[in-house]
Structure formats: C-alpha cells, structure tokens
Amino acid sequence: MKGKFRFSLKRGLLRPSWNKYNIYNIARKQLPALNNRTLYQKKWNAKKETRSYHGPQLREYQLKNAFRPKLEGVISSLDNKLPIPFMNQTYAFLESRLDMSIHRALFASSALQARQLVLHGKVHVNGKPERRAYRQLLPGDLVTVDQKSVMNCVSASSNNTPSIQDGKQTEQVSSKDGENEKKKDNDDDLFEQTSNGKLPSINETISNFVPKPFMSLMAFIPAYLEVCFRTCSFVYVRDPVARPGLTEVPSPFPEDLHALAYTYYIRSRNMRQGAARCQARRLIPQKVRDASFYQGPPELYKKRNVSPKEAFSHRYPVRQGKLTKLV
C-alpha cells in the first residue's frame, strides 16, 4: 500500500522535512487571511498551520495530552529592552522528544525518518538502545545514532557501501595466481590492522558524501544541542527557552500565529479538565469522595421519609418522665 503524500501543493502546509515539494511550499508560503473570521476560526486556522510543522508525527489527542501551558523565558540583561517572544514557545515541549531532536541534529531528513530510525533500533540513549520515539530527553542525555543509517538518510548518493568490498571487486585479476596472491596480501593487511588494534574508520570505509539538494535551507543546529558529526552523536544540553527578541524553537511562523494556536490549546485543555471534574462529581458524591465530610457509612446520608408528627416530635422533644411533686 502506497504511503500518504504529505507535501500537497494545493494545501501548502509546511512540514519539518528536506523534501523538494516542502521547500517549494516554504518558498511560496503566505500567511492566512484572518481578518473576516470569527475568533474560533482564527484559532483553528492558526492551529492547523502551526500544527503541520510542529509534531506532524503525533495524533491530535497525543499532542493535547503532552501540551504544557507554562512557557519558559530568560532575561539576559537589564539593558536589553526587546520583548521576549513567549508565544513562540508554544511547541517547545516537542523539541525534547527523541525523534524531533534527532531531526534537529541533522541526522535525519525529516521527523518521520528520525522516528523510523528509533523504531528500527538504530539509536542509543546513554549507551542503551532506545525504541521509544516519544521519550522526553533530560538535560545531559547523550544520543548516538548508527553512522551508516545516518549516511543513508542524509546523503544523496546511493553508493554508500564500504570501500573495502569495492576494492576487492575492482581488484580482481583474470589469472588465479594473481587472485590468490592479492587475497593473501589483503588478509595479511587486515590481520596486522586487527592485531595492532587499528580498524578502518567510518570515514575510510564510506564513499564520498553528497548532501541532499535543498538541504542548506534547514542546515542549522539549535543552541540547546551539542552535535558531534564524527561520532554521529549529540548531547541534549537543556530545554529551549525564549530570550529578548529571540526564541530557540525553530519555526517559520510569526508570534501572532503561535499566540492564536496557544489560546486554542489552552482553551481545549481547560474544557477537558472541567469536563473531567464534572464527571467525577456525577460518579462520586462529594461527601463520600472528601475525607473531611465522611463520618460513617453512606446510609447515614440517605434521607428518610419522616411523617410530620415524627418531625414535630424531633424538633420539640417532650419529657417522658413524670414531674416530681413539690411539697
């Protein structure tokens, strides 16, 4: 079954990918006209535009469950009076995901491809294999990706096989004597390398690296990652924050559009929490649910059908004993 095509030129939604159709959509992208729309329509359109770029590999309920209303920012100095773009931090909680951080480190051409690397067991976190693409990285976590898989994902050339095998195939000689002699020489060289503890490195075995076309548009590394391309690993230093006039969350959309998306998600979050509270009140009575009100079995709180005579006697009790005579 053919996969769904995510780079529609008609819809023009942006994706975190190096695909040529996505780059074309970025080049001709225009902000949606929200003048003659209601407030809810503005929020919905802003959510649709920003949601396609931030976390397209997630379902809507997954993003709503992981949404964090708290937006983090820092002030560098008192002299810098530029406003802090807090609203651009709406999707900052997605940047700590394992698959998204691999894409930001330029080890995969898209977030979906980074997720595929994690599911196939090509990623190690702190020296241990990790198959959960939704894992939230903590500051100081070391992520290592398989080098050959990175070359297959990032390089445009299909000839990424080791050069040792290519050398064996190209150095074939018609005579059997020449083949035996060269095989012996190669075996002796490999034996010397292994005995001395020197194996061919990844730079020597992999053919020439050819970057993918249109890669330069997204070839940047955020400030919260420290990347080492020689070992295909990176360190998640800290969570992204907003500074005066600067945000560390990469996004092609302005702050106003992120503000509308933030109000949409914060409204849906409050509605879900309110519905959960109402459901809890309907299912569990307040006197049974709260320990301060509970003072016995539930039968004590059920109302009894009392006759008016009994109610009057309870209100105005009559002394049953006889009065003593006064002498």
From Swiss-Prot:
Keywords recorded for this protein, A-Z: Mitochondrion, Ribonucleoprotein, Ribosomal protein, RNA-binding, rRNA-binding
CDD domains linked to this entry: S4
Classification via InterPro entries: Ribosomal_uS4, Ribosomal_uS4_CS, S4_RNA-bd, S4_RNA-bd_sf
Assembly and binders: Component of the mitochondrial small ribosomal subunit (mt-SSU). Mature yeast 74S mitochondrial ribosomes consist of a small (37S) and a large (54S) subunit. The 37S small subunit contains a 15S ribosomal RNA (15S mt-rRNA) and at least 32 different proteins. The 54S large subunit contains a 21S rRNA (21S mt-rRNA) and at least 45 different proteins. uS3m, uS4m and uS5m form the narrow entry site of the mRNA channel.
Cellular localisation: Mitochondrion
Record-level Gene Ontology MF annotations: rRNA binding; structural constituent of ribosome
Function (record text): Component of the mitochondrial ribosome (mitoribosome), a dedicated translation machinery responsible for the synthesis of mitochondrial genome-encoded proteins, including at least some of the essential transmembrane subunits of the mitochondrial respiratory chain. The mitoribosomes are attached to the mitochondrial inner membrane and translation products are cotranslationally integrated into the membrane.
Membership in a protein family: Belongs to the universal ribosomal protein uS4 family.
The keyword Mitochondrion is annotated on this UniProt entry: yes
Compositionally skewed regions (Basic and acidic residues) per UniProt: 174-186
Lineage of the organism: Eukaryota, Fungi, Dikarya, Ascomycota, Taphrinomycotina
GO biological process terms, semicolon-separated: mitochondrial translation; ribosomal small subunit biogenesis
Matches recorded under Pfam families: S4 (PF01479)
rRNA-binding keyword on record: yes
GO CC field: mitochondrial small ribosomal subunit; mitochondrion
Protein name: Small ribosomal subunit protein uS4m
S4 RNA-binding domain mapped to chain residues: 96-154
Start-end of Polar residues biased regions: 156-173
Region (Disordered): 156-199
PANTHER family hit by this protein: 30S 40S RIBOSOMAL PROTEIN, SMALL RIBOSOMAL SUBUNIT PROTEIN US4M
Disulfide bond sites: none
